[in-house]
Amino acid sequence: MIEASKLRAGMTFVTNDGKLLKVLEASHHKPGKGNTIMRMKLRDVRSGSTFDTSYRPEEKFEQAIIETVPAQYLYQMDDTAYFMNTETYDQYEIPVVNVQEELKFILENSDVKIQFYGTEVIGVQVPTTVELTVTETQPSIKGATVTGSGKPATLETGLVVNVPDFIEAGQKLVINTAEGTYVSRA
């Protein structure tokens, strides 16, 4: 059992009514009057829906034991993404709604990890950084580096990130998958 005050982003837990929830954001909130509460943004792992809620810090939940296996992203068809276990060659179908954030960072044949809760496939874990190619960005303007504000760039997966002014279309970039931000040129 884990207390609500110990839940952090990325953790998965089971509620008293059996829902499997993943913490997207968690923060302590102390109103002017009253007791401290934990405000959380959660994703229902099975349905993919996200919602905001709050819990008392002392509320207890069962921490979900999540196992991972190495896999490869194969392709997406309609509203389903297909993955293959690289050890057993078993294939898994995951609804896109459950992995839409992760799909922004991976291309076909990318290595990932499939997450299981018991025998149930619940998600995908992507590497901490990935290399993606810029498909579209504004041209560099001479002397624009003075402001240092950057410019938006569309990557080959459709992800849009803010990049420095010297980045041009066709360049490979290293992207931080946890924050969805530019790290460096590859």
Swiss-Prot record:
| Biological processes annotated in GO | peptide biosynthetic process
Q: What is its main location?
A: cytoplasm
The protein's matches in InterPro entries, at most eight in alphabetical order, are given as: Elong-fact-P_C (IPR015365), NA-bd_OB-fold (IPR012340), Rib_uL2_dom2 (IPR014722), Transl_elong_fac_P/YeiP (IPR020599), Transl_elong_KOW-like (IPR013185), Transl_elong_P/YeiP_cen (IPR001059), Transl_elong_P/YeiP_CS (IPR013852), Transl_elongation_fac_P (IPR011768)
Q: Ribosomal protein: is it a keyword of this entry?
A: no
Q: Which Pfam families match?
A: EFP, EFP_N, Elong-fact-P_C
According to its record, what are the GO cellular component terms?
cytoplasm
Known pathway? Protein biosynthesis; polypeptide chain elongation
Keywords, A to Z? Answer: Cytoplasm, Elongation factor, Protein biosynthesis
Does Cytoplasm count among this protein's keywords? yes
Q: GO molecular function: any one? A: translation elongation factor activity
Q: Which domain of life is it from?
A: Bacteria
Q: Which cysteines are joined by disulfide bonds?
A: none
Q: Where is this gene product found? A: Cytoplasm
- Could you tell me what this protein does? Involved in peptide bond synthesis. Stimulates efficient translation and peptide-bond synthesis on native or reconstituted 70S ribosomes in vitro. Probably functions indirectly by altering the affinity of the ribosome for aminoacyl-tRNA, thus increasing their reactivity as acceptors for peptidyl transferase.
The protein's matches in HAMAP family, at most eight in alphabetical order, are given as: EF_P
Family classification: Belongs to the elongation factor P family.
Name of protein:
Elongation factor P
The lineage, from the top, is: Bacteria, Bacillati, Bacillota, Bacilli, Lactobacillales
Q: Which gene encodes it?
A: efp
